[in-house]
Regions:
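SAM-dependent transferase fold signal centered on methyltransferase-like domains
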Residues: 2-324
């Protein structure tokens, strides 16, 4: 598993794009025509677009870069690319998937229908195609509903991008269902409280990981997210392989790109316990569901069981995913 640090990439222009917004809106500018209509313009990797009143953070550009890179590689190897951008905001990801990854089709969805005009204006830089074979479509429904309807109609996607707030793991099952075998699932969590171990019951409910405060909470946040997806997929008889993970301090934001395939995990070695001693700083991983038996004598004999935080937790909690 790669863990990448945040870094801003330089802009790469796309001169072939129709650009209805002159260059005076260089990187981020606001133009208020009246109190009710607000236009905000941004530029990312050479693409100009509007954000309007939608939720947009330019700090997330690297996360979008990585999604686009994975999508472009997928298109190269499979010669097809259908994408569902489930929580698209102003539609910048959808636009970048269409332009940079040359997606054949993007379904851009955001529950907030106030974003519709902005999304449509942004995507209209790419010709929409015919009614029978559109390049892009915009919808405004709960992402779970869109994905479930696609699944029921057997309209599967090569890449599903879930750019959600907090630790909303309710998207996992519908997203996995609507994904083609060997497809890519790009997930997000912004729940720093859970990864920091401050809401163990919440992380347990969301991802099946009882997380306590650890000095490497950023890594734990990524593993927590991967672990939740692994568990959901395994219920459906599917296997998840992490391709990359990315932590960014703004938010904080945890992103993981997963490949989902047929076939169960070969054994339970992907489930582990992580122990950490707050006194000596020693950290240890116990692999497999037999960990409890392995850990018991260790914890009984060491100061962990009486003074360390994790000696007892090891016996009482489900595992957090440790090995990918
Ligand atoms: C983090 S923002 C998306 C940002 C966008 N992907 C980008 O890269 O700029 C999350 C978006 O999800 C939308 N949203 C929240 N709950 C949703 C749901 N259940 N289904 C679909 N969209 C939802 C919000 O309106 C918001 O625009």
């Amino acid at each position: 598993m790669w863990v990448l640090a945040s870094k801003t990439l330089s802009s790469v222009p796309f001169p072939f794009l129709y650009n209805p917004i002159p260059n005076r809106h260089s990187s981020s500018s606001k133009l208020k025509l009246n109190s009710s209509v607000k236009f905000e313009y941004e530029t990312e990797r050479g693409l100009d677009f509007e954000t309007g009143e939608s939720f947009f953070r330019h700090e997330s550009a690297t996360g979008r870069d990585l999604g686009v890179l994975a999508a472009a590689l997928y298109k190269k190897s499979k010669a097809r690319l259908r994408i569902l951008d489930g929580l698209c905001g102003c539609g910048i990801r959808s636009l970048r998937y269409l332009v940079e990854a040359e997606a054949d089709f993007v379904l851009a969805n955001d529950a907030n229908d106030d974003c519709r005009d902005v999304i449509c204006r942004n995507l209209s830089k790419v010709p929409r195609g015919s009614d029978d074979e559109p390049r892009w479509t915009v919808t405004h429904t709960d992402a779970n509903r869109v994905m479930t309807e696609c699944y029921l109609q057997r309209e599967f996607f090569d890449l599903i991008d879930i750019d959600s707030f907090g630790s909303d793991s309710s998207f996992l099952r519908p997203a996995i269902n609507a994904l083609r075998f060997d497809g890519l699932l790009y997930l997000t969590s912004t729940d720093g409280y859970s990864s920091g171990g401050h809401r163990p019951h919440h992380s347990l409910a969301a991802y099946g990981a009882y997380v306590r405060p650890l000095p490497y909470s950023n890594e734990i946040g990524l593993r927590m997210l991967i672990g939740g997806a692994v568990r959901e997929a395994s219920v459906l008889g599917l296997r998840v392989v992490p391709l990359f993970s990315y932590y960014s301090y703004h938010g904080p934001v945890f992103r993981v790109m997963l490949r989902v395939n047929r076939g169960k995990l070969s054994d339970n070695s992907h489930y582990s316990f992580v122990s950490y001693c707050h006194q000596c700083g020693n950290s240890q991983t116990f692999h497999g569901m037999n960990s409890v038996r392995l850990v018991a004598p260790v914890a009984m004999q060491s100061p962990l069981s009486s003074r360390g935080r994790f000696g007892q937790d090891l016996f009482t909690t489900p595992p957090i995913l440790q090995k990918c």
